[in-house]
Every structure is written in C-alpha cells, then in structure tokens.
C-alpha cells in the first residue's frame, strides 16, 4: 500500500506530464492502490483518482470501482470527498453508470452526503440529461425500495428546476417513455408523484399532451374492469386516479370516458361504496368528482341512459313533501332531511349533461314523472329559502375575522351551496327547462365572470322558483372565504389524496405492494 509521500510523488509525475500523463500507467496504478491505505491516503486517492481519470480509459473500470470503495468508506469525510468527485467520472459511456451509482447513493441518511449526491446528479444532468435519466430510471425499475422511492422524489422535485436547454423535447419524450414502464407497477403515492412529474413537462402542456396524460390515468384507473364498490382498494384507486385526471380536462380534452364510467358503474352503487380512509364521506367525494368532470364531457354514446341514471340518483335526494293531516299539519311528524351538499353535485351534473339532451325532461319522461319531479323541486326550493334566510341573518354584518371562525366558515359554504342549487332549480322550472345558467361549484375558487355573464351562482334567491329573486347579502361577504369542501358540516376539508401514500394490499395491475427487488450493491 502506498504511503502519503508515494501518492504525492506519483501525483507529481502525472501532473508534470500534462497531456502525456497516459504514458505513466504505473504512477496512476499507485494512486488507485491508495484506496487500500489509511484515512490520509484514502482522502488523497479520492481527489487524485478522478483528476487523471480521463488519461487512462483502459483503467476506467478499476478507477471507478476504487472510487466506489471510497464512497462506501466508514469515515463520513472520506465518503463525502469521494461522492463530490464522482461527476468527473461521467464521461462518454461511463455517464449512465455514474448516474446509476449516484442514484443508489440517494439512500444515504447523512444529510450532507445526501445533498452532495443531489448536487452531483444535477451536475451530470447538465452534461447529458438522457444518460442521467437512464441511470435514475434503471434504479427506479430494478433497485431497492428505498432507492426507488428517493429516485422518484428526486425527479419530482428537481426536474422542474432544470433549464429548457437541458430538458429538450427529446429528453421529455424519454421521460414519458420510461415513466410508462414504471407506471405498469406503482403504488398510489408513486402514481401521484409521476403525474406531477409528467404534467410539468413542457411538451405535455399541449392539448395532445394533456390527452396523453388522461389516457395514462384512464389506464391506471382500469376503466375496462368491473367495478367492485365493496373493495376499498378498488374504490380508492378510482378516486385517486380521477382526482389526478380532473385538472387535465378542458373544453378540448374531454372527460367523457370517466363521466360514463361514473354514471354506469359508480352511481348505481353509491350507497355500497367503501373506503379505507377514516372519516371520509366517500359518497360526497364521488359526487364532487362527477360534478367537476361533467363540465368537460364530450359526446356520449349512451347519453339518454346515463342521464336517466343521474336523474334517478338525484330523485333519491329530492324528497316529496310530507303528507298533510286533515288539520293541515305534517302527518308524519318529521320533515324529510334535505341533503344540500349531495343535491348541489347531482343537480349540477344533471344540468351539465342535460344541455346535451335538452328535451330529456319534456320528451323522455312521461307527464306523471315530470309532474313528480317538479313537486320535488318546489318542495326542495321552499326548504332552501328558509335555510338561506337563516344563513343570511346569521352572517349579516359579519366581516373580516368574524367570518373566519369555524362556525361561520361552514355557514359561508352553506350559503354558496344553497345559492347554487337555487339558480339551477330556477333553470329547470322554465318551460321548457333551461340549461343556460352558470354556477361555480361551492368548493371551487370563484372565477371573475365576464360582464355579459350575469347569471351565475351570485344570483340571489326567491321564495318560489319561478318568481323574481330578492336582494342577497353583499357579494364581498361571500367571497372572503373559499373553502375546499362543499359539505357544510363540521368537516370542511376536502380529502387530499396527495398526502396519503399508496394503496393497501396487493394491486392486481400495479396498485399495492411492489415485488421484492432487493439486490444489494449492483454498481
């Protein structure tokens, strides 16, 4: 084993030789042997090996392996020095291997070491992005779970920081192709991270790019398979995938496939849905997703059939008025409970799809069915007015901090919900029914309307649907707080899939626990 003095002497030989250093193979071999010495010798070797690496291509494997030994040394300072120098080995055909090595080193629990690995990866990204990605994806597909997890997180956080000259169209196409391979076997959390990665790529910001992403999500959601409402993982997967798809939909990227699936398979089983998430109102979550998607539904093959399913589900939440006794009082003794949050979602979805078949209520329903529906609408609208008056009275004069209490937040949400329902009911009371009004769903941020877009959820309410609306509360009072959820109960928060992690148990097609890939060091 060489001493410190021998290492310095051989370093001098190579340094003095400059461009002819390659002729002094023996001197470089002495430096390589320095990794077998003590701490001082190893520190010198960690610096000297990469400095002259380019002059000895025939010793490339030996040099890289020697540096790797130092990357695994027990002395943290030696490890850090060796890792810091790794990018100097990333030349030509060696770069993917160095990227692979650095990806494996992401499993380090030493924060300074971990940061060095991140910086080293970013530096070789700028040399050859595609080659670096090859190393990262190699470990994501075949590496140990901890390496896979950290490699995915590296991509999800660091890719967006790279300049356009690094993330070229060719590089982005490579990311998409490799991501598709990974998506064949992912957990729920990994899927969310990959959607974050892919949706951030410039080449996928186009209409065709968004359409590709929607198709990827649809494949993950397994929309061709039979829906099992009693399987929490099946339900959870559908909701998580749908939640990823919703931001991708637009007037040019349609939600038809998802809306059709929800109408045909999910709505009929709404009451049977199960979820592994404690405290989640799974039925409301499904209805909210359907409402959000319904705005972007394109031409649907079985429109009338699916509109009928939606209509039937809406009727379940719009009760008939209770029968009155001879003295005019409620014979049953108890008023039916009005589920405003559910009705907002269902009525909005029906209103959106109804635009595509405007004669559904008049031509597709018999007269008795239409009469029954209008009775339900009128009864619901009466209850709505009572509730709206109570809410306005409770919120009257309250501004600023007073509106930020939990109780008042709930009331503000409730007022948005009831205003929305009222606007939609008024539309359906037109003869023939109208589908022209525009409302903003209660859990969505309020969009600034154009001057000509007068009929929105800011429309005020009336004592009966067909009559002129009375004055409502001040507009700014309702816009102070835009809560995430449309259910006005003590639970205001909208369920966040991004913060939940993966699915439980086996996945079938990729959802659940991944197979065992532990292989030890594979440098």
From Swiss-Prot:
Residues 502-515 have a biased composition (Gly residues). Residues 460-471 have a biased composition (Low complexity). Its main location: nucleus. This is Apoptosis inhibitor 5. InterPro entries: API5, ARM-like, ARM-type_fold. GO terms for molecular function: fibroblast growth factor binding; RNA binding. The keyword Nucleus applies. GO terms for biological process: apoptotic process; negative regulation of apoptotic process. Monomer. A motif (Nuclear localization signal) lies at residues 454-475. It holds the Pfam family API5. Antiapoptotic factor that may have a role in protein assembly. Keywords: Apoptosis, Cytoplasm, Nucleus, Repeat. It comes from the Eukaryota. Residues 446-523 are annotated as: Disordered. It is found in: Nucleus; Cytoplasm. Residues 487-497 have a biased composition (Polar residues). Belongs to the API5 family. Residues 1-360 are annotated as: ARM-like and Heat-like helical repeats. GO terms for cellular component: cytoplasm; nucleus. The keyword Cell inner membrane does not apply.
């Amino acid at each position: 084993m060489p001493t410190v003095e021998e290492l310095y002497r051989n370093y001098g030989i190579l340094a003095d030789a400059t461009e002819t250093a390659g002729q002094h193979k023996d001197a470089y071999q002495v430096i390589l042997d320095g990794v077998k010495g003590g701490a001082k010798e190893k520190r010198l070797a960690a610096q000297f090996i990469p400095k002259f690496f380019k002059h000895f291509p025939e010793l490339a494997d030996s040099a890289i392996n020697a540096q790797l030994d130092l990357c695994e040394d027990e002395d943290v300072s030696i490890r850090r020095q060796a890792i810091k120098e790794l990018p100097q080995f990333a030349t030509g055909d060696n770069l993917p291997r160095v990227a692979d090595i650095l990806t494996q080193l992401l499993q380090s629990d030493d924060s300074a070491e971990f940061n060095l690995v991140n910086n080293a990866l970013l530096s070789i990204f700028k040399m050859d992005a595609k080659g670096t990605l090859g190393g990262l994806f190699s470990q994501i597909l075949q590496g140990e779970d901890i390496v896979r997890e950290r490699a995915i997180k590296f991509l999800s956080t660091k890719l967006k920081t790279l300049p356009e000259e690094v993330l070229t169209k060719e590089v982005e196409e490579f990311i998409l192709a490799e991501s598709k391979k990974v998506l064949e076997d992912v957990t729920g959390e990994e899927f969310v991270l990959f959607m974050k990665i892919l949706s951030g790529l410039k080449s996928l910001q186009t209409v065709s790019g968004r359409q590709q992403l929607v198709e990827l999500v649809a494949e993950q959601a397994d929309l061709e398979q039979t829906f099992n409402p009693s399987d929490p993982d099946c339900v959870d997967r559908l909701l998580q995938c749908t939640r990823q798809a919703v931001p991708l939909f637009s007037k040019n990227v349609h939600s038809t496939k998802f809306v059709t699936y929800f109408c045909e398979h999910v709505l009929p089983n709404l009451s049977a849905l199960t979820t592994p998430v404690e405290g989640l109102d799974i039925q409301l979550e499904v209805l909210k997703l359907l409402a959000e998607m319904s705005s972007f539904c394109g031409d649907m093959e079985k429109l009338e059939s699916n509109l009928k399913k939606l209509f039937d589900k809406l009727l379940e939440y719009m009760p008939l008025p209770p029968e009155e006794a001879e003295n005019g009082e409620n014979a049953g003794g108890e008023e039916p409970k009005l589920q405003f949050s559910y009705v907002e979602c269902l009525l909005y979805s029906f209103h959106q799809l109804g635009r595509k078949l405007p004669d559904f209520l008049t031509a597709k329903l018999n007269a008795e069915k239409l009469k029954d529906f209008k009775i339900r609408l009128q009864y619901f609208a009466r209850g709505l007015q009572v509730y709206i008056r109570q809410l306005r009275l409770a919120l009257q004069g309250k501004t600023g901090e007073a509106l930020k209490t939990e109780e008042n937040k709930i009331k503000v949400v409730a007022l948005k919900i009831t205003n929305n329902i009222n606007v939609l009911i008024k539309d359906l009371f037109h003869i023939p029914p109208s589908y022209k009004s525009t409302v903003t769903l209660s859990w969505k941020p309020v969009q600034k309307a154009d001057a000509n877009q007068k009929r929105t959820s800011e429309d005020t309410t009336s004592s009966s649907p067909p009559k002129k609306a009375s004055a409502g509360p001040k507009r700014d009072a309702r816009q102070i707080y835009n809560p995430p959820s449309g259910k006005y109960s003590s639970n205001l928060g909208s369920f966040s899939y991004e913060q939940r992690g993966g699915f439980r148990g086996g996945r079938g097609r990729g959802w659940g626990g991944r197979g065992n890939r532990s292989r030890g060091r594979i440098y």
